[in-house]
């Protein structure tokens, strides 16, 4: 393949510089961030996400989880996407991430498509995650789950495996630990219960719920017996079970399951103990009112997406979401 001439390289540099200069440098996120610089950015992301979900419906949950795991580790900055190299340690091999987060190839696909229509690296990988999560929720849940994503994040040049290990909530957390974990991110009880509704889609590995189905009493015995068929006491760590009975639809079955002690994860069932707590009341509300769940879920997703974003001239806009420039 012929190499690029110095003139061509210079023209590309000038183009990228001009495009970058058009991007607002204020620190406020806004849904209109790309309206002028690249109006086709968001429709392009939605198109790629839609085709990815049509290929594999599970990918919607994976993209939502990526956004969550990104934001809870030093803010929504795309750090979760960075690969390990001989001189750089990313977050992908942190205990809460390994064998859990996936969908990186779809993010690569989105990045390539967006850079093509924008004629350069205009949209950050962090904004791609936030938008892909929204599109996944809206595609799998319908119009009531659509919301305007706030945009303008930039990408981190660093990552922290230690922070990922420390900051991401464990499926074995009790209620107090969950509250403390979310509070450290500026999120409250309503955010905890609403965002946990992300488990209305997706699957869990046997290793994350084995102890619950064999050793806990706060679980429907028939439900526990059904889970034991796919999750033996020994072996089968990577066997999957849906987090609720409709793992490819965003709706409120997850909350109804909690009322009957059918939460797959220990941390899920901690949200409802039938003692009249604030979280109990929210679970009861969402279990019978999908619109209330949708409204609070969207509000909390927007709030989560505002956790310590890099803006203005902080960080960078990556050429490749898997590595820094």
Swiss-Prot record:
Substrate binds at residue 169. It comes from Medicago truncatula (Barrel medic). Keywords: Calcium, Disulfide bond, Glycoprotein, Heme, Hydrogen peroxide, Iron, Metal-binding, Nodulation, Oxidoreductase, Peroxidase, Secreted, Signal. The active site is at 69 (proton acceptor). The gene is RIP1. Pfam families: peroxidase (PF00141). Glycans are attached at residues 87, 174, 215. It comes from the Eukaryota. One of its GO terms (biological process) is hydrogen peroxide catabolic process. The record marks 65 as: Transition state stabilizer. Its EC number is 1.11.1.7. Removal of H(2)O(2), oxidation of toxic reductants, biosynthesis and degradation of lignin, suberization, auxin catabolism, response to environmental stresses such as wounding, pathogen attack and oxidative stress. These functions might be dependent on each isozyme/isoform in each plant tissue. Gene3D superfamilies: 1.10.520.10, Peroxidase, domain 2. Expressed in the differentiating root epidermis following inoculation with the bacterial symbiont Sinorhizobium meliloti. GO terms for cellular component: extracellular region. Residues 1-21 form the signal peptide. Disulfide bonds join 38-118, 71-76, 125-321, 206-231. GO terms for molecular function: heme binding; lactoperoxidase activity; metal ion binding. The lineage of its organism: Eukaryota, Viridiplantae, Streptophyta, Embryophyta, Tracheophyta. This is Peroxidase RIP1. Binds 1 heme b (iron(II)-protoporphyrin IX) group per subunit. InterPro entries: Haem_peroxidase, Haem_peroxidase_sf, Peroxidase_pln, Peroxidases_AS, Peroxidases_heam-ligand_BS, Secretory_peroxidase. CDD domains: secretory_peroxidase. Ca(2+) 2 binds at residues 200, 244, 246, 251.
């Amino acid at each position: 393949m012929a190499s690029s001439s110095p003139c061509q390289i210079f023209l590309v540099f000038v183009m990228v510089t001009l495009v970058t200069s058009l991007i607002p440098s204020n620190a406020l996120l806004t849904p209109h961030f790309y309206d002028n610089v690249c109006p086709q950015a968001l429709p392009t992301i939605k198109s790629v996400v839609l085709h990815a979900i049509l290929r594999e419906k599970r990918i919607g949950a994976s993209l939502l989880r990526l956004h969550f795991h990104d934001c809870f580790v030093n803010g929504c900055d795309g750090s979760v996407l960075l690969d390990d190299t001989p001189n750089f340690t990313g977050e992908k091999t942190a205990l809460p991430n390994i064998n859990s987060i996936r969908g990186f190839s779809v993010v690569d696909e989105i990045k390539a498509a967006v850079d093509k229509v924008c004629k350069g690296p205009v949209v950050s990988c962090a904004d791609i995650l936030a938008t892909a999560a929204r599109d996944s929720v809206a595609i799998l849940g319908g119009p009531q789950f659509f919301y305007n994503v706030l945009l303008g994040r930039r990408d981190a040049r660093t990552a922290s495996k230690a922070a990922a290990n420390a900051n991401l909530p464990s499926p074995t957390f009790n209620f107090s630990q969950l509250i403390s974990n979310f509070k450290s991110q500026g999120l409250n009880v309503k955010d905890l219960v609403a965002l946990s509704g992300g488990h209305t889609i997706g699957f869990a590995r046997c290793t994350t719920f084995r102890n619950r189905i064999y050793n806990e009493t706060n679980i429907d015995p028939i439900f526990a017996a059904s889970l034991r068929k796919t999750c033996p006491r020994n072996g089968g760590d990577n066997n999957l079970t849906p987090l609720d009975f409709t793992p490819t639809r965003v709706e409120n079955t997850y909350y109804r399951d909690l009322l009957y002690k059918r939460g797959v994860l220990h941390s899920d069932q901690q949200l409802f103990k039938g003692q009249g707590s604030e979280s109990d009341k929210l679970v009861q509300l969402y279990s019978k009112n999908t619109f209330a769940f949708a409204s609070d879920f969207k509000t909390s997703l927007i709030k989560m997406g505002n956790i310590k974003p890099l803006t203005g001239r902080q960080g960078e806009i990556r050429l490749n979401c898997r590595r820094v420039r």
